[in-house]
Each structure stands twice: as C-alpha cells, then as structure tokens.
C-alpha cells in the first residue's frame, strides 16, 4: 500500500487509537504490524473476526485478557535448562491462567446463539496446563517470596531457622539486660550486620566485651560486636539459611524444568493470545466508534451510508452518504473553502484503508466497501524545501507517480486538483489527469474550485458532479455532500450579504464570461429546485411516519379489543356451562322424585305432588333460558335460515349442541329449541339446519318422554376428536338421556391418546348423579380406549 497515502490519510492515528485498546504487549505487536491487505478472502475473514469480537464484548462485557505477559524469552531459557526466577514463573502462571479461562469461556457456552467460529477456533487451540499453573502458585507467593508450601523440606528448614533466631535473641537479651554489660553498651538493642546478630559497644570498652567486630559507626564511637557466646549459634543459623537457599533453588529449577518440557505449547499460546488480544482490540475500537462491518463486494464499488470521519468529534461530525464505482467512476466535488470537501475525501480513503485492515467503519448498516490493490492520495500542501519544489511542483511530482502506478483496481483521491498555478492551465491539466485515470478504469474522487471541471463532469460519461452545501443565510457551510449537484460559486451572494453594493456586484458580473453567468444561473435554479424537493420529501416522510404511528396505534387497539372479546366469550361460555350443569343437577333431582312417585299407586295427593314437581321443572327451565341466552355471545351461521318448522333438528352454534324446533316466530325470526329437556328461544342466525329431522311431541307426559328415549338412546357415546370441554358437555347430555331412557350400563368411547381426555371424563363421571360405578374396558369391550359406566 502507498506509504504517502497512509500518511496523508492519517492511518497512523487509527493505529494509535487501536493500540490504546490492547491489553498486552502481545496484542500491540499485531497492531504495530497491521497494514491494509489486498486479498479479498483475507479481508473478509479479518472483518468477520472483528465482528465476532465486537459481539462477544457486547454480550459478555469484560473478556478477561488482563494478566497476559510476553513470556517467550523466559520459556526459551527454561527450554535450554536455565532456572527461572520467581517473578518469571509467576508471569508464566498468570499467562497460563488467562489461556485456561479464555478457552473455557469462549470454547463452550450455554447461550444458544453463542457461535463465533473464528474466535472459538483460536481459543480451542490454546494449551491448558493447570497442573503447572497450580504448582507455581502453590510454591511462589510473590516475585521475592517462596511459600512454605513449596516443599516439606523448606517448611522444616524455616521452622528451625525461626527457632534458632529465637534462641540467639534470648541469649543476647540476657547479655544486654545484665548489669555487667549495661555500662559497656551504647544502647540496649540487638542489630544485624550482614546476617550476624551484634550488639552496639562503646569503643573504649572494646577489650571488656569478647567477640568479633563486624562494623563501627561513622563517628567511630560505637563498635558492633558479635559476642563470642553466640558465634556458634550464628554459624548454625548461617548453615540453615544456606540450606534454605539451596532448597529454594531446587524448587525453582524443578518448576523451570516443567515449563521447559511444554515450551513449544507455551510459545504457541503466546501467538494465539496475541491474536485474541488484537481481535478484541478491534472489537473495542468498533464499539467506541459505533462501527459496523461493511458488506464486502468484488465489483469495485463503494457505498458509504452516513459515514462519519473516525478522528473527528462524534458529537460534531456531520455524516455523509458517498457512493462511487457503479453509475460513475469519477466524482468531482466543488464547494467553498472549509466546507468539508477535504474531510469527505479523507473519510472515503480512510474507510478503504480501515476496511482492508479488518477494521469496522463508523457508518450505517448496509454500507458496502471493496478491496483495492492500492489507494493513492494527493492531499495538502507538502512542498519540499530541501528539493526546492513549489506547491504546484510538489503536487505534480506526486500526481506523476500516481499516474505511473495506477490500475483499474485502484482508488485515487485528489484534493484541489490543478491548484497552485495559472487557473486556465491548472483546469486543463486537471481535466487531462482525470481523463487519463478514467481511461485506466480506476475509481477517483477529486475536489476543485474550477468551473471547467464542473462542465467536464456534466458532459463526460462516467464522471459525476457533487457539491458541499452552503447556507447563504448564515454564510456557513453545512458540510453535507450532495451527489449529482455541481457546486455553485457563492461569491456574489456572500458579498451582498456582507454589504457590498449592488452596483459593484453588477460591475463584477460584467467581467465574467456570459456562459459562466448562464451556468451559475442554471446552478442557482437547480439548487432552489433541490431544496424544494428535499422539503417536499421531508414533509412526505413526516406524513408517512404519522400514518405509520396511527396504524400502529390502531393495530394495538384492535388487538386489545380482540383480546377483550375473546376473554368475554370464554367467560360467557364458562358461566353458561356452569349454569347448565347446575340446572341439570336440579332436573336430575326432580326426575328422580317423579320416577319414584310414578312407581307408587296414584292418588290425588300424589298426582298433585307430581304436578307441582312438573311446574317446578318448567319454572326452572324457564328462568334458566333467558339467563343462558343473555350470556352467550351470538355467533352467526354461515347459511342464513329463512324458514323453520316444528320438529326440524337444528344445531345451536353458540352451544355446539343439536336440538329440536318446538315452535317458530317468523316475524321475529326466532325459534323455541329443545336441547335435551331444556328449552331456549334463539334467533335464526344462531341456528344451523342439520341433515336429519326429528319429530318431537312437546306435549307428551314425562312417562312418554322416558318411553320414547328408551328406544332412541344408544348404549354408547363416541367422544373421540373432541376437546375436554366439548366432551364433558356431550357426555353429560348423553347420561341425562341414558338415565331418562332407563339404560343400566353404557360405554363411553374416549380413545387412548395422551390420556388427558380419559382422565377428565373419569373425574366427571365420579361426580355425576346418575353414575353408580365406572371401570375401564376389558378385552373385547374396547380396552383402555373405553370406560364402562353403570347407571343408578
């Protein structure tokens, strides 16, 4: 990749931002070596790696990379047999712990959507040596301290050292506290010189205290003497400390040997940990920049949606949409100074470099980038004092180099192409340069002040105009890029706003070529029409948003109403079902009493009693009818009934039950329907004709009803295919009929299925007043798919 382009596009500043996200020197090595890649497959993989890291950070927060150290040199020393110091071993243990935890947390997860093949492939490659990790932590407390737990020998030596120290101190305390020695001592204290215990003796009493002089004070007034009585004890202490040091060296050597045995795996871990740190650094930077993974295309076009320059303040930067490479290969941008032209072209160039480095770009989802073989940029004033080159010469030297190396797969960026020389010649050179680049097929973005380039873009195929917007009212740029609109000079308008007289402005216009004036007028009209179109589009979008909002509110209210309706229907059905069951229980009692009375001899008193019970039954059914009717939410039949006759069989849609028509009111379009022994007045629209008609004489006595039932009621009922609620309604109606018909035993067919229907029905049968007993079907009766019921 062109080094000059990397510099002028400030690629190094992106690298500096990335470095701040690294957790270790291993990750920094990868970042420092990062350069844009030109291989499509590799770039795609690099971008996916960044996306995986970004997603994991968002889900998990901290990844746990803290504690990684660069241990390669230490591991290599252990491999050749060197003994490592405690600090080095602690660093190795820390790095092993990070590797183990990363492998455990990234390789497997209980989260269903935790699927990150690139990151997980890296973490799965990490070697785990928890035994080495544990032994190092068990043996070493810090960089300067070995634990007593390192070995039983070390623990014993240190115990003996402590005892010997105590013995020496006790002996010295007895010396310094004795009246004999007190006058010889400078202070009643015990000191150490080297690793020998001494007492401070006044120099004039040197001959009075037998011992070895180890030191003296700066004034010479005090001598530090090791009394002869403890010399042997100090020697023993010295021997113990030498033994301690030997044991420590043995322990460190043993731990170092363990590290050396797995040195290749640990060095492999270093590479993987560095790669993971690098990947998560990219993920962190993406989150900071609110970056996205651009779609990568092989057609050499870019489409940046609301791209934001990554080095500018996120709160102030203006997002711009930029596209290049499909309908046109060259984009010519015009507009005022400080209007954002340079920032715009730098954004495009930097996005290309970032994408090819596997970094996310701060833009909206749906942005698309491609892989260029090179990115060339000529931006800024880089005149060379050493080479005595002018601004124009400096730019032209760079442009010559670009033209010599550009290919069809390159991206070229020019800032103020042709500037720094005579405007006429500069414009001509600029057009010629763009022609040459366009003929090669490279993609190019150029900024300019020359109106000749605007005319060139208007007439040349494959070249498009663009402008940075300028607000005449505020005399300030808006930094918005408008592709397809050539930039307009605002010198006259700005001058008028600043107070320049119309006379001077008119005189100035006389010195301009009439063609240029006409072009400026056209551009002014285009700009007015564009602003009007933008306003109309914004108004249309506002209205669309309001309509969408109203639609959402309507859908929410409709959903709420439907939910309320369904709840009301379910509640009504439940209450109706409860009322019907209660009524049936009352009817059962009355029928039972009627049958009991009919078995006795008739008498006036008994006949009167029967008549009262029949009236009570009629009253009960009559009071029940409007209650149930009012609670049932009407359902309309698919086929409207125009005419009904008494005796016809109909289906009551609201109850999902069949009944017989007793009487008909054609004017009100209502019919009295008998369902079992219950009568209800229902509208035609809630009824549906069935194929089978039955004749029912509603004036028959209870005895005749019982006799007619006995001939028509079957000794079995098939409930298969019904849900539990429907089955309960059906079986209770059937048991009423069977009981009235005088059947002694019936078969309830429910099937095997999941067992829910069978269990629910058997529970209802246990509580039914007509049921004497029940049992499961036997072989030949239907087996587990039926229940045999004995009636009272």
UniProtKB/Swiss-Prot annotation:
<keyword id="KW-0255">Endonuclease</keyword>
<dbReference type="Pfam" id="PF00488">
    <property type="entry name" value="MutS_V"/>
</dbReference>
<dbReference type="GO" id="GO:0045910">
    <property type="term" value="P:negative regulation of DNA recombination"/>
</dbReference>
<comment type="function">
    <text>Endonuclease that is involved in the suppression of homologous recombination and thus may have a key role in the control of bacterial genetic diversity.</text>
</comment>
<dbReference type="InterPro" id="IPR000432">
    <property type="entry name" value="DNA_mismatch_repair_MutS_C"/>
</dbReference>
<keyword id="KW-0378">Hydrolase</keyword>
<comment type="subunit">
    <text>Homodimer. Binds to stalled ribosomes, contacting rRNA.</text>
</comment>
<dbReference type="GO" id="GO:0030983">
    <property type="term" value="F:mismatched DNA binding"/>
</dbReference>
<dbReference type="GO" id="GO:0016887">
    <property type="term" value="F:ATP hydrolysis activity"/>
</dbReference>
<keyword id="KW-0699">rRNA-binding</keyword>
<comment type="similarity">
    <text>Belongs to the DNA mismatch repair MutS family. MutS2 subfamily.</text>
</comment>
<dbReference type="GO" id="GO:0006298">
    <property type="term" value="P:mismatch repair"/>
</dbReference>
<dbReference type="Pfam" id="PF01713">
    <property type="entry name" value="Smr"/>
</dbReference>
<keyword id="KW-0547">Nucleotide-binding</keyword>
<dbReference type="GO" id="GO:0140664">
    <property type="term" value="F:ATP-dependent DNA damage sensor activity"/>
</dbReference>
<dbReference type="InterPro" id="IPR036063">
    <property type="entry name" value="Smr_dom_sf"/>
</dbReference>
<dbReference type="InterPro" id="IPR005747">
    <property type="entry name" value="MutS2"/>
</dbReference>
<dbReference type="InterPro" id="IPR002625">
    <property type="entry name" value="Smr_dom"/>
</dbReference>
<dbReference type="InterPro" id="IPR045076">
    <property type="entry name" value="MutS"/>
</dbReference>
<dbReference type="GO" id="GO:0004519">
    <property type="term" value="F:endonuclease activity"/>
</dbReference>
<dbReference type="GO" id="GO:0043023">
    <property type="term" value="F:ribosomal large subunit binding"/>
</dbReference>
<keyword id="KW-0540">Nuclease</keyword>
<dbReference type="InterPro" id="IPR036187">
    <property type="entry name" value="DNA_mismatch_repair_MutS_sf"/>
</dbReference>
<protein>
    <recommendedName>
        <fullName>Endonuclease MutS2</fullName>
        <ecNumber>3.1.-.-</ecNumber>
        <ecNumber>3.6.4.-</ecNumber>
    </recommendedName>
</protein>
<dbReference type="Pfam" id="PF20297">
    <property type="entry name" value="MSSS"/>
</dbReference>
<dbReference type="GO" id="GO:0019843">
    <property type="term" value="F:rRNA binding"/>
</dbReference>
<dbReference type="InterPro" id="IPR046893">
    <property type="entry name" value="MSSS"/>
</dbReference>
<dbReference type="InterPro" id="IPR027417">
    <property type="entry name" value="P-loop_NTPase"/>
</dbReference>
<dbReference type="InterPro" id="IPR007696">
    <property type="entry name" value="DNA_mismatch_repair_MutS_core"/>
</dbReference>
<comment type="function">
    <text>Acts as a ribosome collision sensor, splitting the ribosome into its 2 subunits. Detects stalled/collided 70S ribosomes which it binds and splits by an ATP-hydrolysis driven conformational change. Acts upstream of the ribosome quality control system (RQC), a ribosome-associated complex that mediates the extraction of incompletely synthesized nascent chains from stalled ribosomes and their subsequent degradation. Probably generates substrates for RQC.</text>
</comment>
<dbReference type="GO" id="GO:0072344">
    <property type="term" value="P:rescue of stalled ribosome"/>
</dbReference>
<feature type="binding site">
    <location>
        <begin position="335"/>
        <end position="342"/>
    </location>
    <ligand>
        <name>ATP</name>
    </ligand>
</feature>
<keyword id="KW-0694">RNA-binding</keyword>
<keyword id="KW-0067">ATP-binding</keyword>
<keyword id="KW-0238">DNA-binding</keyword>
<feature type="domain" description="Smr">
    <location>
        <begin position="717"/>
        <end position="792"/>
    </location>
</feature>
<dbReference type="GO" id="GO:0005524">
    <property type="term" value="F:ATP binding"/>
</dbReference>
């Amino acid at each position: 990749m062109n080094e000059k382009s990397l510099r002028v596009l400030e690629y190094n500043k992106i690298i500096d931002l990335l470095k701040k996200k690294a957790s270790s020197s291993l990750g920094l090595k990868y970042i420092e070596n990062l350069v844009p890649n030109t291989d499509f497959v590799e770039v795609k993989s690099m971008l996916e790696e960044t996306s995986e890291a970004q997603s994991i950070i968002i889900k998990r927060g901290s990844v746990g990379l803290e504690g990684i150290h660069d241990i390669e040199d230490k591991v290599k020393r252990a491999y050749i047999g060197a003994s490592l110091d405690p600090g080095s071993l602690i660093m190795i243990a820390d790095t092993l712990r990070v590797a183990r935890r990363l492998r455990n947390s990234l390789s497997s997860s209980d989260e269903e959507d935790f699927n990150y093949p690139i990151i997980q492939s890296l973490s799965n490659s990490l070697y785990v040596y928890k035994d080495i990790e544990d032994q190092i932590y068990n043996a070493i407390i810090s960089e300067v301290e070995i634990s007593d737990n390192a070995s039983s020998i070390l623990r014993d030596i240190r115990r003996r050292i402590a005892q010997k120290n105590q013995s020496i101190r006790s002996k010295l305390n007895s010396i310094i506290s004795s009246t004999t020695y007190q006058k010889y001592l400078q202070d009643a204290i015990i000191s150490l010189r080297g690793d020998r215990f001494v007492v401070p003796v006044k120099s004039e009493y040197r001959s009075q205290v037998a011992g070895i002089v180890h030191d003296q004070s700066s004034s010479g007034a005090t001598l530090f003497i090791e009394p002869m009585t403890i010399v042997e004890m100090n020697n023993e202490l010295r021997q113990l400390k030498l033994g301690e040091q030997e044991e420590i060296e043995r322990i460190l050597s043993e731990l170092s040997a363990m590290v050396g045995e797995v040195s290749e795996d640990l060095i492999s871990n270093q590479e993987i940990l560095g790669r993971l740190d690098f990947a998560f650094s990219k993920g962190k930077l993406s989150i900071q920049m609110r970056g996205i993974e651009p779609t990568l295309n092989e057609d050499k076009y870019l489409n940046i949606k609301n791209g934001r320059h990554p080095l500018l303040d996120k709160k102030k930067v203006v997002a711009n949409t930029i596209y290049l490479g499909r309908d046109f290969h060259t984009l010519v941008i015009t507009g005022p100074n400080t209007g954002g032209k340079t920032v715009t072209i730098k954004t495009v160039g930097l996005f290309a470099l970032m994408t090819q480095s596997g970094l996310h770009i701060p833009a909206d989802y749906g942005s698309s980038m491609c892989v260029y073989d090179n990115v060339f940029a000529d931006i800024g004033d880089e005149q060379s004092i050493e080479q005595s080159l002018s601004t124009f010469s400096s730019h032209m030297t760079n442009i010559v180099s670009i033209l010599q190396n550009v290919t069809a797969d390159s991206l070229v960026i020019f800032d103020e192409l042709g500037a720094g020389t005579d405007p006429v010649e500069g414009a001509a050179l600029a057009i010629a340069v763009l022609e040459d680049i366009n003929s090669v097929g490279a993609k190019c973005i150029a900024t300019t002040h020359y109106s000749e380039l605007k005319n060139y873009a208007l007439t040349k195929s494959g070249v498009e105009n663009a402008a940075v917007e300028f607000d005449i009212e505020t005399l300030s740029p808006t930094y918005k890029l408008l592709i397809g609109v050539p930039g307009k000079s605002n010198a006259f308008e700005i001058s008028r706003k600043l107070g320049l007289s119309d006379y001077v402005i008119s005189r100035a216009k006389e010195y301009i070529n009439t063609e240029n004036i006409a072009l400026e007028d056209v551009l002014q009209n285009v700009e007015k029409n564009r602003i009007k179109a933008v306003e109309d589009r914004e108004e249309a979008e506002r209205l669309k948003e309001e309509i969408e909002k109203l639609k959402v509110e309507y859908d929410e209210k409709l959903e709420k109403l439907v939910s309320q309706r369904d709840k009301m229907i379910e509640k009504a059905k439940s209450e109706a079902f409860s009322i019907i069951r209660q009524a049936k229980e009352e009817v059962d009692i009355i029928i039972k009493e009627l049958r009991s009375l009919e078995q006795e001899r008739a008498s006036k008193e008994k006949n009167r009693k029967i008549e009262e019970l029949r009236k009570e039954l009629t009253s009960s059914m009559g009071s029940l009818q409007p209650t149930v009717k009012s609670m049932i939410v009407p359902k309309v039949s698919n086929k409207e009934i125009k005419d009904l006759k008494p005796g016809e069989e109909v289906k009551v849609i609201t109850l999902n039950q069949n009944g017989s028509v007793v009487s008909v009111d054609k004017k009100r379009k209502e019919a009295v329907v008998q369902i079992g022994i219950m009568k209800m007045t229902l509208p035609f629209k809630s009824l549906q004709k069935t194929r089978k008609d039955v004749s029912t004489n509603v004036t028959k006595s209870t005895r005749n009803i019982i006799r007619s039932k006995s001939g028509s009621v079957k000794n079995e009922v098939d409930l298969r295919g019904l849900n539990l609620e429907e089955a309960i309604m059906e079986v209770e109606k059937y048991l009423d009929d069977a009981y009235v018909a005088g059947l002694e035993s019936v078969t309830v067919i429910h099937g095997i299925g999941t067992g829910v229907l069978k269990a629910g029905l058997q529970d209802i049968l246990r509580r039914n007043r007509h049921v004497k007993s029940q049992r499961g079907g036997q072989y030949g009766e239907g087996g587990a798919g039926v229940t045999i019921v004995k009636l009272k």
